[in-house]
From Swiss-Prot:
It comes from Human immunodeficiency virus type 2 subtype A (isolate ROD). The N-terminal domain is composed of the N-myristoyl glycine and of a cluster of positively charged amino acids. It is required for inner plasma membrane targeting of Nef and virion incorporation, and thereby for infectivity. Residues 88-96 are annotated as: Acidic. Factor of infectivity and pathogenicity, required for optimal virus replication. Alters numerous pathways of T-lymphocyte function and down-regulates immunity surface molecules in order to evade host defense and increase viral infectivity. Alters the functionality of other immunity cells, like dendritic cells, monocytes/macrophages and NK cells. One of the earliest and most abundantly expressed viral proteins. Transmembrane segments: none annotated. One of its GO terms (molecular function) is GTP binding. This is Protein Nef. GO terms for cellular component: host cell plasma membrane; membrane. Homodimer. Interacts with host CD247/TCRZ; this interaction induces down-regulation of cell surface TCR/CD3 complexes.
Amino acid sequence: MGASGSKKHSRPPRGLQERLLRARAGACGGYWNESGGEYSRFQEGSDREQKSPSCEGRQYQQGDFMNTPWKDPAAEREKNLYRQQNMDDVDSDDDDQVRVSVTPKVPLRPMTHRLAIDMSHLIKTRGGLEGMFYSERRHKILNIYLEKEEGIIADWQNYTHGPGVRYPMFFGWLWKLVPVDVPQEGEDTETHCLVHPAQTSKFDDPHGETLVWEFDPLLAYSYEAFIRYPEEFGHKSGLPEEEWKARLKARGIPFS
């Protein structure tokens, strides 16, 4: 109700794929092209796909971006600074980045095996996560999207520790994380797109691997995470406590 033009029209909701592409990538969001062994990027405001081992043509100066993981200072410090800035940014502008309703559109519900399968296929048909670089920020955006749009409580998305392929620990989620080798040309210069997820993904991973999402329909029937790494489920593994703790310790995985 009220006079015409008195209400401010909100921007139409974007799809999950676009939200994830815009996360931390700026104008350099992209995918891993497995067949070509390269990643593809999409310029903001354009549907044109560009293939490149780096984001050429964009000049960056140190200090332009608080979140840019520069080579100096030391690698460990830059990793920690990147992670902290990444999480600060996630907390500060989630609503602007994800652009979903503040409250869930449907009643909250826990993730189930059937629901995880359905959501996996739904995401795939809507453009999907296939070949998209994984990051902590995109992980959180996916959680927020499914909670606000589908009412799914965000306590389900976990993956095995690694290194190597990371299998979903929730049975029925059909997206696993696969490490890829990203071309290293230009990594020691300041002219490539240092904020591209292909460059920053490794800072989010304890093993320094660059990961991409990959759809695997067989995960609907085979609980690979539990079969391969039961110790990561702790008391739920069915193993004696001494055994699963010993396995975690041998793999260098902290436990309480």
